[in-house]
């Protein structure tokens, strides 16, 4: 093979012909340089960047755990407040029921007292009415006796033809006559 001395194309072909054709095996100088670069990058990351990342991750983990603990404590506190609220609500309902029962009992007592007072007043009014009626009846009977006595005396005087002026006498006679009429009326009943 003849190769032109300074031709680029021919130089490339010459170099390509000299290298063995093994595409799966890496070139060792590249591997060594790659490992050194990887070690430098790994060292920089592990010394500079990794602590910052780990610190940030640890802070986030602590914040999350703290948030969970706070949420749990808040939930426990909320449950406690809910239980207190339920207890207060039950107590208020019990108190309201007790007050309602007391009000009903007091209302029943007041109604009974008012009924008794009304009955007593009714009986007093009836008794006063009976007393008044009896007094009016006696007054009317007395006035009627006097009027009947006077009319009877006048009528008797006209029938007899003489005046019966003896007041005491006529009064006794008329009273006696009316008493006899009342006794007969009561016996007939």
From Swiss-Prot:
TM region positions: 25-45
Disulphide-bridged cysteine pairs: none
Gene Ontology MF: a single term: proton-transporting ATPase activity, rotational mechanism
Presence of keyword Cell membrane: yes
Keyword list, A-Z: ATP synthesis, Cell membrane, CF(0), Hydrogen ion transport, Ion transport, Membrane, Transmembrane, Transmembrane helix, Transport
InterPro entries: ATP_synth_B-like_membr_sf, ATP_synth_b/b'su_bac/chlpt, ATP_synth_F0_bsu_bac, ATP_synthase_B_chain
Claim: Transcription is one of the keywords in the record: no
One GO CC annotation: plasma membrane
Subcellular location: Cell membrane
Membrane topology: Single-pass membrane protein
Gene3D superfamilies the UniProt entry points to: F1F0 ATP synthase subunit B, membrane domain
Subunit structure: F-type ATPases have 2 components, F(1) - the catalytic core - and F(0) - the membrane proton channel. F(1) has five subunits: alpha(3), beta(3), gamma(1), delta(1), epsilon(1). F(0) has three main subunits: a(1), b(2) and c(10-14). The alpha and beta chains form an alternating ring which encloses part of the gamma chain. F(1) is attached to F(0) by a central stalk formed by the gamma and epsilon chains, while a peripheral stalk is formed by the delta and b chains.
Entry's family note: Belongs to the ATPase B chain family.
Function: F(1)F(0) ATP synthase produces ATP from ADP in the presence of a proton or sodium gradient. F-type ATPases consist of two structural domains, F(1) containing the extramembraneous catalytic core and F(0) containing the membrane proton channel, linked together by a central stalk and a peripheral stalk. During catalysis, ATP synthesis in the catalytic domain of F(1) is coupled via a rotary mechanism of the central stalk subunits to proton translocation. Component of the F(0) channel, it forms part of the peripheral stalk, linking F(1) to F(0).
Protein name: ATP synthase subunit b
Species the sequence originates in: Streptomyces griseus subsp. griseus (strain JCM 4626 / CBS 651.72 / NBRC 13350 / KCC S-0626 / ISP 5235)
């Amino acid at each position: 093979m003849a190769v032109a001395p300074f031709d680029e194309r021919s130089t490339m072909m010459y170099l390509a012909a000299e290298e063995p054709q093994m595409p799966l095996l890496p070139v060792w100088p590249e591997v060594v340089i790659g490992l050194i670069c990887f070690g430098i990058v790994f060292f920089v990351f592990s010394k500079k960047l990794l602590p910052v990342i780990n610190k940030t991750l640890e802070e986030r983990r602590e914040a999350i755990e703290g948030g969970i603990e706070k949420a749990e404590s808040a939930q426990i506190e909320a449950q406690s407040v809910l239980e207190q609220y339920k207890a207060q609500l039950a107590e208020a309902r019990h108190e309201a029921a007790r007050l309602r029962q007391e009000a009903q009992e007091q209302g029943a007592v007041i109604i009974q007292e008012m009924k008794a007072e009304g009955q007593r007043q009714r009986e007093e009014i009836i008794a006063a009415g009976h007393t008044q009626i009896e007094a009016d009846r006696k007054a009317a009977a007395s006035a009627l006796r006097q009027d009947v006595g006077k009319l009877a005396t006048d009528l008797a005087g006209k029938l007899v033809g003489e005046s019966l002026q003896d007041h005491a006498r006529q009064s006794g006679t008329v009273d006696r006559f009316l008493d006899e009429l009342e006794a007969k009326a009561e016996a007939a009943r």
